[in-house]
Regions:
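Surface-exposed, short loops/turns at beta-strand junctions within beta-sandwich domains
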Residues: 98-105
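Conserved structural position at the C-terminal beta-strand
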Residues: 112-114
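Short strand-edge motifs at loop-to-beta-strand transitions and within beta-strands
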Residues: 91-97
Length: 356
């Protein structure tokens, strides 16, 4: 009998012994349980410094007696906090917690209890995020304070963006995060969507727009870049990286330049673009692409988000039939590709300063 088999046999024997002891103990002491299942939800993402309200429900006392509730948020709380108000099984019980100033992941644990009964518990995780760009926010790794960047403030909502000049045009170096509905002058085109429908993520990953929304979302004096603007950007990137731009075309593949547009950034200290040896991330254009993926939107269904750690996808103003041209970067390939997407696709938007 080899060592692995000995270990497996020992583990099995211990499990059988433990089960035997447990059965004998269960015969001696019966544990009483509360009725129902504890339900509470924590938002997936929250802004640092914000106040979050939680509501727990779903549990009742078998004898309709009062229930108590205590909770703990970690990191942040050294010990649990018991609520003074008795738990209401019909309407639930709500409490608030103020999120700290540091972007991080929290665990929220909730317990409902009654004398003589085993407590019912549930836990959720949530991630706090910050749009600060001074090195203490959620996105770090890009030095926007270098002399290569300028800034622009959108008068519509007061949000500011870093900009960079590349390919003879001034580009947003961050994804547009305008959250209000846009119009083509005659029709309301609706709003874009933030990542996983979390408002807290709007200023982190930007807003995901359909192509028609993207055509009208940029502030006055800025526009959705067309294929020619992207081509000029790609040619400059090729020069920066010392690769040939021969064969580059508006709707073609930009060979060997993806790293010139990618930034080696982290989200809450976790690297966004996984390392692949064939992709040399230099961000030599200052474009600062993040791996935010794309979304599929359709009618009243909840948008589905994909490839947030694998791709960066950007609309252009060019169309073909009822589709729009987009360019995309993948984590494991040095080339920038192009494709055509229908109106059910939502992607990131980089505004470029209007030529006129």
């Amino acid at each position: 009998m080899n060592f692995k088999k000995i270990l497996r046999t020992a583990v099995f024997a211990a499990a059988v012994a433990l089960a035997t002891v447990s059965c004998k103990k269960d015969e001696e002491t019966a544990v009483a349980y509360l009725s129902g299942s504890l339900v509470f939800k924590a938002p997936g993402y929250v802004k640092t410094g914000s106040e979050v309200t939680f509501t727990a429900s779903g549990v009742t006392h078998p004898e309709n007696k009062p229930l108590g509730l205590y909770y703990k948020v970690t990191p942040g709380m050294e010990k649990s906090d018991t609520l003074d108000v008795p738990f209401d099984p019909e309407n639930g019980l709500s409490w608030t917690y103020t999120i700290g100033d540091e972007p991080q992941t929290y665990t929220v644990a909730c317990y409902v209890f009654a004398t003589g009964y085993s407590a019912s518990s549930s836990s959720q995780t949530m991630v706090s995020v910050s749009s600060r760009t001074d090195g203490t926010g959620s996105i770090t790794g890009t030095d926007f304070n270098s002399g290569a960047y300028s800034s622009f403030t959108d008068e519509r909502d007061g949000k500011s963006y870093f900009t960079v000049t590349a390919g003879g045009r001034e580009w947003f170096a961050q994804n547009l995060a305008y959250e209000e509905a846009v119009s083509d002058g005659e029709n309301d085109l609706g709003c874009g969507v933030p990542y996983v429908n979390s408002e807290a993520m709007a200023d982190i990953f930007g807003i995901y727009y359909t192509q028609e929304q993207a055509r009208h979302a940029c502030p006055d004096g800025w526009e959705l870049p067309d294929g020619e603007a992207w081509l000029a950007l790609a040619v400059e990137a090729a020069g920066n990286e010392g690769v040939s731009s021969d064969g580059f075309a508006v709707a073609g593949t930009f060979t060997g330049i993806a790293g010139a547009l990618m930034t080696d950034a982290a989200f809450n200290t976790i690297t966004m673009w996984e390392y692949w040896p064939q992709v040399k991330i230099t961000n030599s254009t200052g474009f600062s692409a993040l791996s935010t993926g794309f979304a599929t939107v359709s009618g009243d269904t909840v948008p589905a988000f994909e490839a947030a750690t694998q791709k960066a996808v950007f609309w252009t103003a060019d169309t073909e039939g009822d589709t729009g041209l987009y360019h995309y970067i993948t984590v494991d390939n040095p080339d920038i590709y192009s494709g055509y997407g229908y109106e059910s696709m939502a992607a990131s938007l980089r505004c470029v300063k209007s030529a006129n």
